[in-house]
């Protein structure tokens, strides 16, 4: 129990007892799908570039695809039907072929949106120059074990220091300016258990913290200036912690395959709130935080997109993926990735990807 801020805790408890209020009008704007009847193309990662105008996606297709958000929304405006259906080949501005299936993407800070990093199923971290459309950096230090997550820190101006989490049970911290054989640090959150590191994220506000989600059912927060031991252990999930995201410098959101999200205080490690409603028992379904609106988006194994407001434990908005194409007959489809556009205050954009390769763009605005 947090005795330092009793008034704040009382406010949180009162909000938990309130009924969730629907303060946002969210609607489906654009659906991007392929006319090909080829095998499933799971979208495992979605990222906006620093301008918030380019969307990159990746997954098992061995391609990083790039879309212009304004053109996707423009298609919707032209159609006049409420929802615009666009073929992937037309909507995709360009793509880069990769040597392996990808699990994660992240734009490298300080590159002007020119360099994007990726983690793949073969245990390799690569960076690509988008102007040349060629790889410019490669690290193979996870022993061939799948890399689940990559991220970069903005702390202290060291914008090129990155980290990767892998099935090998480690978080590797590295600097792309240094030779591949050199490492800033190696962290084993679960110790000798070597449980998979499923997610890593640095504090996007520039603080010295890096959060880690592990298959040992715990989350961890480290100070990058002292990586020997975690500054905080987040214990409360009953299954794998698949995602961890900073809401701000003082709170972290985790997702677990126990079917819930949890909001934590970085100050003392207590659970502020638990969020339930979506279905997640096995797969990676995505987690994204819109910091300006304090909204969390995640996918679900019932093929729906869920949005939670930090103030309430039940979803404030739910929408199902529309069946598209020849793959729509499968009852095993699920929403596999989500990403909020960070710009805006009273308007928002959420992009979600499915296990069938379908990309859906949602737009919303705050109700008067």
Swiss-Prot record:
<dbReference type="GO" id="GO:0005634">
    <property type="term" value="C:nucleus"/>
</dbReference>
<keyword id="KW-0287">Flowering</keyword>
<dbReference type="InterPro" id="IPR001680">
    <property type="entry name" value="WD40_rpt"/>
</dbReference>
<dbReference type="GO" id="GO:0010224">
    <property type="term" value="P:response to UV-B"/>
</dbReference>
<feature type="repeat" description="WD 3">
    <location>
        <begin position="141"/>
        <end position="184"/>
    </location>
</feature>
<dbReference type="GO" id="GO:0005829">
    <property type="term" value="C:cytosol"/>
</dbReference>
<keyword id="KW-0853">WD repeat</keyword>
<dbReference type="InterPro" id="IPR036322">
    <property type="entry name" value="WD40_repeat_dom_sf"/>
</dbReference>
<dbReference type="GO" id="GO:0009658">
    <property type="term" value="P:chloroplast organization"/>
</dbReference>
<feature type="repeat" description="WD 4">
    <location>
        <begin position="192"/>
        <end position="232"/>
    </location>
</feature>
<feature type="repeat" description="WD 7">
    <location>
        <begin position="330"/>
        <end position="368"/>
    </location>
</feature>
<protein>
    <recommendedName>
        <fullName>WD repeat-containing protein RUP2</fullName>
    </recommendedName>
</protein>
<dbReference type="GO" id="GO:0043254">
    <property type="term" value="P:regulation of protein-containing complex assembly"/>
</dbReference>
<feature type="repeat" description="WD 2">
    <location>
        <begin position="97"/>
        <end position="138"/>
    </location>
</feature>
<keyword id="KW-0963">Cytoplasm</keyword>
<comment type="subunit">
    <text>Interacts with UVR8.</text>
</comment>
<dbReference type="Pfam" id="PF00400">
    <property type="entry name" value="WD40"/>
</dbReference>
<comment type="function">
    <text>Functions in association with RUP1 as repressor of UV-B-induced photomorphogenesis mediated by UVR8 and HY5. Plays a crucial negative feedback regulatory role downstream of UVR8-COP1 to inhibit UVR8 function, balance UV-B-specific responses and ensure normal plant growth. Is involved in the regulation of photoperiodic flowering and vegetative development. May act as negative regulator of photoperiodic flowering by suppressing flowering through the action of CONSTANS (CO) and FLOWERING LOCUS T (FT).</text>
</comment>
<feature type="repeat" description="WD 5">
    <location>
        <begin position="236"/>
        <end position="276"/>
    </location>
</feature>
<dbReference type="GO" id="GO:0009908">
    <property type="term" value="P:flower development"/>
</dbReference>
<feature type="repeat" description="WD 6">
    <location>
        <begin position="279"/>
        <end position="318"/>
    </location>
</feature>
<dbReference type="InterPro" id="IPR044616">
    <property type="entry name" value="RUP1/2"/>
</dbReference>
<feature type="repeat" description="WD 1">
    <location>
        <begin position="38"/>
        <end position="77"/>
    </location>
</feature>
<keyword id="KW-0677">Repeat</keyword>
<keyword id="KW-0539">Nucleus</keyword>
<dbReference type="InterPro" id="IPR015943">
    <property type="entry name" value="WD40/YVTN_repeat-like_dom_sf"/>
</dbReference>
<dbReference type="GO" id="GO:0080008">
    <property type="term" value="C:Cul4-RING E3 ubiquitin ligase complex"/>
</dbReference>
